[in-house]
């Protein structure tokens, strides 16, 4: 995850992007599809939003996309991103959030995992707006869109046991009872990034949980591949979506391997730990300023994403997570882009329908 840097966020204005922007807006408002030529020569189709009936969504098979509410209109720059959105937006605008929720719902996504950097941060304020827009969507269409937060453990405000306890208490008291906060079997769900990074230990997290959630009234999903996390957390997820399996051509084996490890843990400990299989459209963080160890997972015009989805579903997951809806700095977004239009939302819709049954 790469949060925007402070600065002017300079970007080159391109005429073709302006034309695409107008076409997208017309497509959303008008009754027919609008066609435009993509920057890389692809033929892009932008269709009106159509929310599927609630009866078509299986609440026992959630699809949750990692989501970033930190952009301003000055953020967008081809110098720091491998692609650009069809609409350069401000994450704080209600119209932006409403549009993103509609796009996601149309694709069969059931909620966002909102990157969260602490009480009072814009990601906190915008999460409240996300819940409000989700309520508005359900009132208008009957579609239940329920989101949660991604506890960014490396964020300055979230470092150290005392800060973690304080912030989690705020989260649970402020949001957990909202009807559009993601619940699983009646319990609020939280996702945690990199729980064992920066000298954090399982013992520390166990102490945190005793203070914040002594009765295990919530569900905690940890990012990571180490099943020892399950001694404190209720499940694991892979923000990376197991990209090494994509590059190695054995993605299905990777996902099934994690399913088998969790099943073995559950059998040995008489638990019901959760496997959240991740899917990835591609990845490219080579333009992130100052980042070392960058890499690329090629998109292959949607083939990578389809392979990732097929592998995830073959592992009989409890949940499916998408990396990501809109992490533009790392090039892992499915949100409509200049290069691909709404290709990745369309692919999401196809596989989400299969998953929902």
Regions found by a protein language model. Give the residues of each.
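Hydrophobic alpha-helical segments, especially transmembrane helices
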Residues: 14-15, 62
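N-terminal secretory signal peptides that target proteins for export/translocation
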Residues: 1-12
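Residue-level micro-sites within transmembrane alpha helices that shape
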Residues: 12-13, 326
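Bacterial N-terminal signal peptides
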Residues: 18-27
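Glycan-processing catalytic domains of CAZymes
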Residues: 39-357
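Sec-dependent signal peptide cleavage junction
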Residues: 29-40
């Amino acid at each position: 995850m790469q949060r925007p840097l402070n600065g002017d966020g300079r970007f080159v204005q391109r005429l073709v992007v302006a034309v695409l922007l107008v076409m997208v807006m017309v497509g959303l408002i008008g009754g027919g599809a609008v066609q435009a030529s993509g920057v890389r020569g692809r033929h892009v189709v932008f269709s009106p939003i159509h929310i599927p009936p609630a009866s078509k969504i299986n609440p026992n098979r959630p699809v949750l996309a990692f989501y970033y509410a930190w952009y301003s209109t000055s953020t967008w720059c081809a110098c720091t991103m491998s692609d650009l959105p069809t609409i350069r937006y401000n994450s704080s605008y209600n119209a932006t959030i409403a549009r993103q929720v509609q796009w996601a719902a149309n694709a069969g996504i059931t909620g966002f995992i909102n990157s969260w950097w602490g009480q009072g941060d814009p990601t906190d304020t915008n999460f409240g707006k996300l819940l409000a827009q989700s309520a508005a969507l359900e009132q208008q269409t009957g579609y239940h869109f329920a989101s949660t937060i991604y506890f960014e453990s490396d964020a300055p405000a979230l470092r150290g046991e005392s800060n973690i306890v304080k912030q989690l208490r705020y989260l649970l008291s402020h949001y957990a009872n909202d009807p559009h906060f993601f619940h699983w079997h009646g319990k609020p769900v939280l996702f945690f990034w990199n729980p064992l990074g920066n000298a954090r230990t399982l013992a520390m997290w166990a102490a945190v949980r005793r203070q914040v959630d002594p009765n295990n009234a919530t569900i905690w999903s940890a990012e990571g591949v180490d099943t020892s996390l399950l001694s404190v957390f209720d499940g694991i997820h892979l923000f990376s979506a197991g990209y090494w399996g994509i590059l190695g051509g054995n993605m299905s084996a990777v996902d099934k391997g994690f399913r088998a490890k969790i099943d073995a843990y559950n059998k040995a400990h008489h638990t019901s730990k959760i496997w959240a299989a991740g899917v990835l459209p591609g990845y490219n963080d080579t333009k992130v300023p100052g980042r070392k160890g960058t890499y690329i997972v090629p998109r292959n015009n949607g083939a990578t994403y389809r392979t990732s989805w097929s592998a995830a579903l073959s592992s009989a997951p409890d949940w499916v997570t998408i990396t990501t809806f809109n992490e533009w700095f790392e090039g892992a977004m499915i949100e409509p882009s200049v290069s691909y239009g709404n290709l990745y939302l369309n692919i999401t819709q196809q596989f989400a329908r299969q998953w929902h049954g």
